Structure formats: structure tokens, C-alpha cells
Amino acid sequence: MNFELERSDLTKTIVVKIGTSSLTQPETGQLALSTIATLAETLSHLRQQGNRVILVSSGAVGVGCARLGLTERPKAIALKQAVAAVGQGRLMRVYDDLFTTLQQPIAQVLLTRSDLVQRSRYLNVYNTFRELLALGVIPVVNENDTVAVDELKFGDNDTLSALVASLVEADWLFLLTDVDRLYSADPRSVPDARPISLVTSIKELADLQVQTGSQGSQWGTGGMMTKISAARIAIAAGVRTVITQGRYPRNIEKIIQGELIGTHFQPQPEPTSARKRWIAYGLVPVGKLYLDSGAIAAIVKAGKSLLPAGVKTVAGEFEPQDAVQLCDPQGNEIARGLVNYSSNDLQKICGRHSKEIPTILGYVGAETVIHRDNLVLT
């Protein structure tokens, strides 16, 4: 896919994600209207400059809680989904009022993971974004919490925003949060935590021994770990990603103009293809294949297909063309791919030579378990 909208070198596609902690007052859970108004002004100004802008907004559950007088985020799924339905309408009304004042049209786009799992629906979502951006509209995106089920949830809007940025092949992804940048530890509990301004590769984080923590705020779901995971998805698509303070939306324009505010993640110089990004991040893996060292080396170092001889163990139940994770013996994921055999058949041929497949299974199947065209390193 190529997101060509007669763009010039001076205009960009920009995805901005704002979390519940930035949208609401921490003490009451009520909307932080001044922050939202400044965000609307900033995004409208970016649009007026010819940029294509997408806003991924959390807050439906938090706003619903405030509207209903609930003092804490509900844990029961049915109640949370009901509260999200209340909050989403209120949230969109606020956005629509603010953007209308600025004469900027917006659109509500609610997504579930299943919208990205099926390739035809994935492409349909892409086409919808393409048309909205061509019309000069700012799509306001959220997970459809009211209907999403656990098995097909994004889990947090950091992941959703990265998948949207990957889908539309954005130039920038801004993850607005309640801290000003990434630190070597949580600065709220470790006063001497070291700020990190630039990450040239995700592997750098291990070298820096970043202790990001997974906990989110009281009202949100995304901690710093989810933002790093989101950055991994985005930079693989060639999207420059920035973590910065959500209370100061005007910093978005300053960053685009070259100021080094927040933490910047440099994009990969050679982005993964759109189809392989769909395999790696759009699909939900339903099984795991544990590989021997020879197969791992062939895949990682030589870009080879996976053969049955390299599979040591099969976990999960799946059918041909389902997505699976490829793991080392310790369970660390190294790749994902679309498998050519069901889990039942693969159990029978794992560890065997490809030429033995017809004798074992009674039919002539593919020589590969996963062809390299359907395999992507993660």
C-alpha cells in the first residue's frame, strides 16, 4: 500500500495518541477541558498547514465513570463496556464542539482487533482512513470497548495508535502521556532516574537497562512498557515516534519543527512491507512453534523459510494459514508467520524431513511449514 494523497515534501501524516491521564483531571476524573481545547487548536493548525492528522483518543471509560459518579474504573467487563458507551458519546461531543468552533471537521472511527485480523477488512479500514484524510477530516479513533472481547482487544490505545500509524504509513506518531519523556526508571518513584532523549533502536533499551514498569494510571490502561511496545511497531513501519508530555499539546508543532522535546525513537531505514506488518502486528497468533538452533539461525541470519525438521514442539490449536509465533527453546519470540499446516498435522511431521511429509500425512503438502514470504522477524 502507498498512502499517496498528492503529498508534498513539506506536509506529513501525523498520528497523535492522547491517554486518559492527559484528558482528565487526576483528582476527579473530570475532563481537562483546557488541555483538550489546546490539543484541538494544535491539530487544527497542523491541518491548515496541509498535514494529514489522525487523533487516537482514550478516555471513554474514564469519562463514563465521571458522568455516572463512579469513583474507580470498573473491573467487570460488562460494566466497563456499558460505562464506555456512556463516556464515548460525551467525549465525542466535546471534541465535536471544540473542532467545530475551529471549523475543522472530524469523524468518529471505532475499531476492534477483528477489523485488522481479516485482510479484506484491514484494507477496508485503510481505504476509509485514506478517504477521510483526502477530505481534510481529522479521524478520532478509539477501540470499540462496548463490543470488543478479550481475545480480540488491542488492550491499550498505545498499541492501537501504532497499528493505525503503520496502516496509513504515517511520518510521525506522538504518544502523549503524563511524563515528559522516557526515563531509566519511573521518575515518580525514583528521583534520580535518568532521562532518555533519543533511541536509535529498540535494542538500545536493553543496553540502557530501562525499567519501564507496566502499570498505567488509575484511570488508564497503558504504562510506559506499552508505549515502548507501540514504538517497536511504529518504527518497523518507518514511523518516527515520540513520547512526550500530554499536558502541553503545542509541543507537537515544536517537535515537528526540530526541537528535541520528549523521547524520540528513530524509524527503521528500511520499513517492513505492509503485508508483513499485517502478519506481525495485525493478526492475533493462535499457536507457538518452538524451534531448534539451526532453524533459528536459518530464519534470523539467512532469511530462510521454516522447514518441519526445525520444529521441536507445537503448542496451541490452529488451522492452515493461521498466524503463529516462532520461539526459541526458552520461549522468546523471534518471528511470526502464516503456517501451512494444522497443529494436528504439524505434530506428526515436526522434526522430520520435508520429503517424508507425503508418507506421514498421506497427501502431498507444502515443503515448508512457513514460507519466508509469510514470515516476519519480531
Curated annotation (Swiss-Prot):
Is the keyword Amino-acid biosynthesis in the record?
A: yes
Q: Name one GO cellular component term.
A: cytosol
Q: Which GO terms describe its molecular function?
A: ATP binding; glutamate 5-kinase activity; RNA binding
The UniProt catalytic activity note for this protein reads: L-glutamate + ATP = L-glutamyl 5-phosphate + ADP
CDD domains associated with the record = AAK_G5K_ProB, PUA_G5K
Q: A single Pfam family, by name?
A: PUA
> Where does this one sit in the cell?
Cytoplasm
Q: What class of enzyme is it?
A: transferase
Q: Which InterPro entries match?
A: AceGlu_kinase-like_sf, Asp/Glu/Uridylate_kinase, G5K_ProB, Glu/AcGlu_kinase, Glu_5kinase, Glu_5kinase/COase_Synthase, Glutamate_5-kinase_CS, PUA
Q: What is its EC number?
A: 2.7.2.11
The PUA domain sits at 286-364
Chief subcellular location equals cytoplasm
Q: Which UniProt keywords apply?
A: Amino-acid biosynthesis, ATP-binding, Cytoplasm, Kinase, Nucleotide-binding, Proline biosynthesis, Transferase
Which pathway, per its entry? Amino-acid biosynthesis; L-proline biosynthesis; L-glutamate 5-semialdehyde from L-glutamate: step 1/2
An example Gene Ontology biological process? L-proline biosynthetic process
PROSITE patterns tied to this protein: GLUTAMATE_5_KINASE, PUA
Does the keyword section mention Nucleus?
no
Entry binding sites for ATP: K17, T177, D178, T221, G222, G223, M224, M225, T226, K227
| Residues annotated for substrate binding in this entry | S58, D145, N157
- Family indicated by similarity: Belongs to the glutamate 5-kinase family.
Q: Which NCBIfam families match?
A: proB
What is the annotated role of this protein in its UniProt record?
Catalyzes the transfer of a phosphate group to glutamate to form L-glutamate 5-phosphate.
User: What name appears for this protein in its UniProt entry?
Assistant: Glutamate 5-kinase
Question: Which organism does this record belong to?
Answer: Nostoc sp. (strain PCC 7120 / SAG 25.82 / UTEX 2576)
